[in-house]
């Protein structure tokens, strides 16, 4: 197996590959936690390539640069901060000041502004719309995700965005069903197991 295919295989098993969630939520979920503590899956340019491939963003053969890695991480952190604001997330470390929120808004908007637009050109004396010019496919993909994040956080679905309060979880999700309370089945099972354990301890204490 080549190193690129090995990376893609590893990516497919990571916590942020949540096919039912919108891309901004999947980007936020590149920060996740387990029994070993928090993990960051966007540490290198290759990580950005793997993530874009896994979520279906076409890189057109381009590879993320160090600047695009910085942009991806900054966008991810900004969207997480704004999600915490929208959901009134009171998990440890999630709270943010008004200045932080303003800076996060600037980051999302600046990233989205990189979307390529058709260019007006003069051909044979006539004005025509030419093909879009602009950044690399990686930057364009991140700009599209930033645009989707703005729509999610500021649109009708913002009211369905939730923080997952399962023990140790740091993820967010869009509540697609009235009874859904957790980001995943695994988190739901962990909560139920914790409740069962606590009830058993309470019964022992009453005996």
What are the roles of these predicted feature ranges?
Residues 1-163, 170-172, 206-207:
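Short helix-coil boundary/hinge micro-motifs
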Residues 26, 191-194:
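Alpha-helical elements of the RecA-like P-loop NTPase motor core of helicases
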Residues 166-168, 185-186:
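Short, cysteine/histidine-rich loop/knuckle motifs that typically chelate Zn2+
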Residues 168-173, 191:
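Cys/His-rich microdomains that often coordinate metals
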Residues 178-190:
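Cysteine-rich micro-motifs
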Residues 195-207:
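Contiguous alpha-helical segments
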